[in-house]
Amino acid sequence: MNRRNALLLLLAVPVVGCAKEPAKGPRVVVHKSESCGCCKLWVDHLAHAGFTVDVINESNLGPIKERVGVPYGKGSCHTAEVGGYFVEGHVPAADIKRLLRERPKAKGLTVPGMPAGSPGMEVPSGQVDPYDVLLIGNDGSTSVYAHHGSGE
């Protein structure tokens, strides 16, 4: 090896050693039914928004919802956990990012039901039915955290 190549090799080593892995977003664990297509689309929505998503297919979501504190009547087709919060249903990634940034004293967020046009429930016409993202307080209270659809 000549001097020039040796020098280039020595200069390259620190650069290679400094290379960083791409930044990864917050880890979200999604519990869903294996057969649910809209859940898969919501998972894709989160991944495209920069979240690291782990999916666990469940045969019974009831115990998961109960464990994390999803109130009766406020459920949907999948339950996620991120940063000490639950995320129930088709909550937009931007609202989850806001939750993690603001860190309110709460159990989590929910979009009850499956509103047309919410992430994972998009329709060909582009229609978005009005829906609310609800914040579930530690005491079980609910308040509107975000509103989507007409009149946003």
What are these regions (language model features)?
Residues 43-82:
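N-terminal, post-signal-peptide region of Sec/Tat-exported proteins
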Residues 21-23:
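A short beta-strand-turn-helix
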Residues 26-41:
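Local sequence-structure signature of Cys/Sec-based thiol-disulfide redox active-site neighborhoods
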Residues 16-17:
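C-terminal motif of bacterial Sec signal peptides marking the signal peptidase cleavage site
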Residues 1-12:
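N-terminal secretory signal peptides and thylakoid transit peptides that target proteins
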Residues 12, 30-33, 74:
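Processing junctions and N-termini across compartments
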Residues 67, 73-152:
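Thiol/selenol-based redox catalytic cores and closely related redox-interacting motifs
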Residues 42, 60, 92-96:
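Amphipathic alpha-helical interface surfaces
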